[in-house]
Amino acid sequence: MLSVRVAAAVVRALPRRAGLVSRNALGSSFIAARNFHASNTHLQKTGTAEMSSILEERILGADTSVDLEETGRVLSIGDGIARVHGLRNVQAEEMVEFSSGLKGMSLNLEPDNVGVVVFGNDKLIKEGDIVKRTGAIVDVPVGEELLGRVVDALGNAIDGKGPISSKTRRRVGLKAPGIIPRISVREPMQTGIKAVDSLVPIGRGQRELIIGDRQTGKTSIAIDTIINQKRFNDGSDEKKKLYCIYVAIGQKRSTVAQLVKRLTDADAMKYTIVVSATASDAAPLQYLAPYSGCSMGEYFRDNGKHALIIYDDLSKQAVAYRQMSLLLRRPPGREAYPGDVFYLHSRLLERAAKMNDAFGGGSLTALPVIETQAGDVSAYIPTNVISITDGQIFLETELFYKGIRPAINVGLSVSRVGSAAQTRAMKQVAGTMKLELAQYREVAAFAQFGSDLDAATQQLLSRGVRLTELLKQGQYSPMAIEEQVAVIYAGVRGYLDKLEPSKITKFENAFLSHVVSQHQALLGTIRADGKISEQSDAKLKEIVTNFLAGFEA
């Protein structure tokens, strides 16, 4: 009689939907019943009330927890897209796992099935395979443990140096900071490139687009900027340090390998994270890589530190997103891109920000790269990103092949907020340079048709040629801001107007060597003060005049 009552009590305690019961629940219930039978002799010797209490205690003490796992089955698979039936409660952008071990992300939530993009080779998945929810939105490891490492879009190490030891993880699709935590850009982000720091200055927390045709030096500007941060990161002042994240999207593996080698040779990898989703990787990984890199950069920003992230390039991310959207049968729009391609980039670039002191005072600066076709900046993706960012550096093929490198078009390049962050010393020497160069380009176009030019026009042309020569700079050779100030000072104050344009580069190299070796105190004063005082101006004038006399002799 007791056995029947025990069995009935156990059955009543179990959930009614047996299809959802795990083995753990059944096993633990049967163990409770077996334990009761084992102590049946003991129960017979006790009173009815005591026996009931022991029985109740045994049944209530049994582990009846139910581990529910929602699973579905693959209806169709192809082109990196899986249609899955049965995942009724899956979240948007939730990670799911296939029976082969491959991971995917749910993007399309439809009434009868879920569209899942696969992170890898879909040949490992077959129709009818079981798909399991993980309950986790896609996240990546973050933290200083990633510095010096090369990782994929999911944060897995691909540099052969072992797994990432970071214990902190962040979602890749976090919302951008609101209005209240932000503050206007006020600190300079030195690139070490004369043409950029003087004409299109960038501030910490800014979004500055680098745009141009292929093979015009877009990546070179980004890499030089990373290398230039070594002078700040070698110091102990955490406020001056700038941690760098380079996101390679759709590039060749050999290109990424060369880039990592270049950064290693320059001793810049120790403060850099490289996130790589190469051309051979699945489109979902190329789509995800910028968001993963941004989450890694936000870790530094939200901890009161400063970070720089380079997206090279967002054109390929847009192409990968277009591929995924068309395969998911989303309606195409202009140039076959989906309607939310603007939101694709705006929600990414809005995460770059300068935070106010109440929120740590950190910053995340973004340098997105966009590749144009035959200089067409009015195409869909370039115009979108231009409208989102705080300015652009426009690189021209024509200037590049003329030997003007970096091939920055001064007229089309602009920095909307960076001038507020430019150091006062650079403002003092470069204030009129952009106007002079713009006038020079305009006059140079008309000067081709006539030889009779007045003295003022000839002076403008002469100054423009020399300033253009002065702004040329070799690859992987960034300069300190005080060195740039000294060189540009000589050009804009007219000391080089009588020097042959072909000798400008030679003069610059010799002059820099002289100043660095003989007048380190003056450079230190400019660096510390952030401006050119009357004493510094007089000293600089004397140095340039004396050196030029010896150089021409």
UniProtKB/Swiss-Prot annotation:
One of its GO terms (biological process) is proton motive force-driven ATP synthesis. The keyword Transmembrane does not apply. GO terms for molecular function: ADP binding; angiostatin binding; ATP binding; MHC class I protein binding; proton-transporting ATP synthase activity, rotational mechanism. Acetylated on lysine residues. BLOC1S1 is required for acetylation. Glycans are attached at residue 76. GO terms for cellular component: mitochondrial inner membrane; plasma membrane; proton-transporting ATP synthase complex. InterPro entries: ATP_synth_asu-like_sf, ATP_synth_asu_C, ATP_synth_asu_C_sf, ATP_synth_F1_a_nt-bd_dom, ATP_synth_F1_asu, ATPase_a/bsu_AS, ATPase_F1/V1/A1_a/bsu_N, ATPase_F1/V1/A1_a/bsu_N_sf. The modification N6-succinyllysine is found at residues 161, 167, 230, 239, 261, 305, 427, 498, 506, 531, 539. It is found in: Mitochondrion inner membrane; Cell membrane. The record marks 413 as: Required for activity. Its main location: mitochondrion. Mg(2+) binds at residues 219, 312. ATP binds at residues 215, 217-220, 473, 475. Belongs to the ATPase alpha/beta chains family. This is ATP synthase F(1) complex subunit alpha, mitochondrial. It comes from Pongo abelii (Sumatran orangutan). The gene is ATP5F1A.
